[in-house]
Structures are given as C-alpha cells and as structure tokens.
C-alpha cells in the first residue's frame, strides 16, 4: 500500500540519519573551518574560485559542496559550476554565535571517539575538560586571563542567542539592582543594563574573567551603572545588596552538591523576598530531548561536571537552599533556554505561566 511504503521510507531515512549523523557534523565543521558560508554571503560563487581560496583540489571542493547541498547549507545554481547559500547556511550566518560553537565542537568530537570509555570514566587526555579549566580545578580563582579567555569568548558569542529571550521572558524593570553570578565577560550584564535604563548591575565571576567583564563594560560606556566583582562563588560569599540574582547557564555546569552550595550562597546574598532568575537548557523540555539529553548530556559528561536537569529537579535543589516553588516563564526558543523565577521563602511545586 502506498502510505505504508511512505512510512517505511520515512523510517529508513530517519534510521540512516541516525547512523550518518557524525558525517553530517563533519561536513558542517569543514564548511565552517573553510569559511564556505561566509564566502557565499554576498552571492553565488564559482566552484573553482572557492577551491582556490580554500586551498582544496577542485574535485574535493565539489565533494564537499555536494554534501553541503544535501544538508541545505548551500544550493547549486543551475549549471552546477556555481553555488549559493542554502536555507540552513543562511540560518547559520544569521546566528553568528553558532559558528564559533561549531568550530569548538572539534574538542567534543575527539572525546566522543570512544563513547564507552567516556561513559566508564576511562577517557585519557580528554580535550573538553581542560578547555573549561574551572570545572575540575581545586583553585578556580587562581585561573589566569589566557586560560579563561577562550571559553569566556565562546560563552559571549553564544550568549546573544539566549539573552534577549531571557529578558523578554522576565522583565527586570521591577528591580533596582541585579547580581549576575557566573556572568562571564559581562555580555548578559551589559544587555540587561541597556534593556533597563534604571537598573544597576554587578557581574560576578572569577578574577581573571571579571577583568574581561570590566573591559566590556568600559567599551559599552556603562561604567556608571554596571560593575564587575570577583571571587569563587563556591567558596566565598556573594556581594550583597541586589534584589535579584541571575544564574544564566550556570547550574547545569555543576553537580547537585555544588549547585545547592551555590544556591545557598545566593540565598544569603538576597534580602527577604529577593528574586532568583535561573535560565538554562532543561531536561524534559517538550520536543527538545535531543538538545538536553543527547547534546548536553554528553557535552557535560565530557566536560566532567554537571548535567541538564528538569524543572522539578531544579525545584528540589531550590527548596534545599531555602527558596520558594519556582515559576516557569515561557521563552521563544525553550530548547536553548528555559526560565525559572523564584523567591526567598519555602514552596512545594513548579508553577507555569
């Protein structure tokens, strides 16, 4: 029957995608490393020119472009001698924070070459864990600027993908002062300050990272309302005085014990009825299991610390730290980040809005 054949073909394609996914990711990585998408940004290009600029044999470039066309990164223009951006390629260029992340994935792919060794904790000389030096360090506050600059830059590049969603999901206009804990180079802090002209913001991170934040704040001309403070939030008190604290893509980097320790430090820094805003990818997000459970599940495993949690699991940690039941605030792209907001009191369940 025709409809049964269609179902069988659809399942066969899905199964093949599952088997060939690594090849797809490597085609994408090659396009990013060779800057193929940027080369096509201004319009169609001839294959011979692309091959020369990328220092590839022409036939190798054709192989890459055929693969990229199948993935909708590029598309042929009539004569098969010219190509232009495809729909997926244009979407990637429209989200510039994705390109550094794709290039960075080479470290993850190296660690996933033997997934069983990774799962057993037998991976030797992993690539990803050293990149995020603070994750396994006994003295993260001693990190130097050269060691924190790469990951701080990566987080900054991808922060733009989620920051506006967070600010749209929860208005900070009702608050007078924000403490952004684990705020990196100040990307979210400066965006929040621009979005809320009366808001004072403190960006808190490790000393070397805080120096990067100070430079960004100065470049943004926001020094009158935004400052950077430094310390180790797992071993030192947080700056007090703010009525709202944000943890943007922070908790999922840490195990439960460390997460509760951080949440208790946040609770101690907040006034009575102060507000905590949590934003990060969460497990159990409808339609986003491949993001939270596949991608972040294995990324954080290779990183050596943390896990994606469901809102209910986060609620348990919050209650253990003295917070009320949080409320989920809808975001435009929940696969990238969901937003939980809670207050300093006790509570029992996750509410949604």
Annotate the PLM regions.
Residues 279-321:
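C-terminal alpha-helical "lid/dimerization" subdomain adjacent to the S-adenosyl-L-methionine
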Residues 76, 85, 278, 325-328:
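Short beta-strand "wing" residues that participate in macromolecule-binding interfaces
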Residues 323-353:
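Core SAM-dependent methyltransferase catalytic element
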Residues 97-288, 335-338:
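Conserved adenosyl
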Residues 2-34, 38-44, 52-53, 58-176:
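Conserved Class I S-adenosyl-L-methionine-dependent methyltransferase catalytic core
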